[in-house]
Amino acid sequence: MSTLRDNWRVIFLVAAILLSTFALFSPTMGNQSPIGEDDSATNLQFGLQLDGGTRIRAPLVGVTAEDVEFEGDSERVVERQVAAQIAGADAADIIVRTGAESSTVEATIENVTADDLSAALDAAGYAHGEVRDGVTGTTRAETVRVLQSKINEAGLSGGTVQQVTTATGEHFILVEVPNRDQSDVVDLVGERGTVQIDIYYPTGTDNGSRTYETREAVLTQADFTSIGTAQESQTGSGAFVPVSVRDDPAAEFQTAIQDTGLAQPGGTRCTYMEDGGRNTTEGCLLLVVNGEVVNAFGMSGGLADTMRAGEWAGAPSFQLQTRNTSEAQEIAINLRAGALPARLDLSGEDSGTSSYISPSQGESFKFDSLITGIVAVLAVAGVVFIRYGKPQVALPMIVTGLSEVYILLGFAAAIGYPLDLSVIAGFIAVIGTGVDDLIIIADEVMGEGSVKSRKVFQSRFRRAFWVIGAAAATTIIAMSPLAVLSLGDLQGFAIFTILGVIVGVLVTRPAYGDILRLLLTEDR
């Protein structure tokens, strides 16, 4: 028991290595790979620099008015009033935010200018302060959340979304998706992802022709409480997404179906999508995605009966019909992730860019990174052996230093952090600073002659550890701004350099001290 108590730091190091091994290789820790992708031998995820993929860096479309006075109107009323004054806008393109200190109105429709929003607010009767290009920080944060959710729902392993800020104060959204074509990623994140249900119904005749009206947004994304997975239809072509509706909107939807006459005995047959069908069809439910009708469908007799009887709202569920499985999958993703509050400006006019790294180039970067790491380890090993010439000092130093990197790899696998070139640079920095600290320990312990007594060893080790602790604190303080600020690749470098320093001070340096004590002292 005394041996275990005296060497608990070494045991702690071994436990950390075992946990890292579990995180790296356990099937229970790995993310589900999309169908058709090869499974990796480890649970490590790689960024697009090492796996190939697409990077998108773009600002958000929109302008913002500060210090708006709403004159007691609700947010919904303000959105409708302002949207009515901007050509081509609807309430979904206007974001109203109220705060204790300031209230803002954002217009996120394309090609809108600060002058357009200012004129719209004036016409609607709302006093306001400065009107500027760009959106609020809250909108940027919500956009990051929705985009990350979209990427996760689409099964794009290793995809990341973050805000980045330039030195001049410009704000961008940075999207990185490894191992995916540029067109696929742009299609996923380029649209706002709005999904709504409209009712298209006949209202009478005019000169022998039917007349129609559209009741828009009878159901929107916020009205759905459960979204199933996209499924192929068993009765014919097409696909569908099973959904459930919240109680309050379900009652309103049922009333709208009754009022528009869509719930006919025996159901309705919709020919909206056929040539000339818009002028002859019976009532239809329109599935509208990003402002475009992607499908139209009638109502089955059974569903129509429950609507007419007022029973459907008690168990409000139905199927969103689509023409194919890919449409159904897109709709399911948009419903789960939510709509983007503002679109990414991918036009390139405001520095919006997208780039693609081929998988073969990513594999080349992986190989080069591996070679660089091996060269760094061999260089450190050579210097250590030349300096000491004692295997009992040098070998534990190298093994302990490498275990630090292994623990960091396990941590990256556990949290699913995608490795890129900046993180690899952080690992190499950890090897250098880690072995440097171990050399300080060895020099302090052995610099005043041989050490046989455990008491003398502990005294010298404590002096060395104070130096190491001060150096670690300095590194953490220096790197913290890079880790906190959204500075792209520098953030990954800083995070793993700081983690390496922390692991070194808490785990590997104390363990190396215990190993040296066991090998050098006689009263162990």
UniProtKB/Swiss-Prot annotation:
Its main location: membrane. GO terms for biological process: intracellular protein transmembrane transport; protein targeting. GO terms for cellular component: plasma membrane. It holds the Pfam family SecD_SecF_C. The keyword Chloroplast does not apply. Keywords: Cell membrane, Membrane, Protein transport, Translocation, Transmembrane, Transmembrane helix, Transport. It is a multi-pass membrane protein. InterPro entries: SecD/SecF_arch_bac (IPR022813), SecD_arc (IPR024912), SecD_SecF_C (IPR048634). Belongs to the SecD/SecF family. SecD subfamily. HAMAP family: SecD_A. Involved in protein export. This is Protein-export membrane protein SecD. The lineage of its organism: Archaea, Methanobacteriati, Methanobacteriota, Stenosarchaea group, Halobacteria.
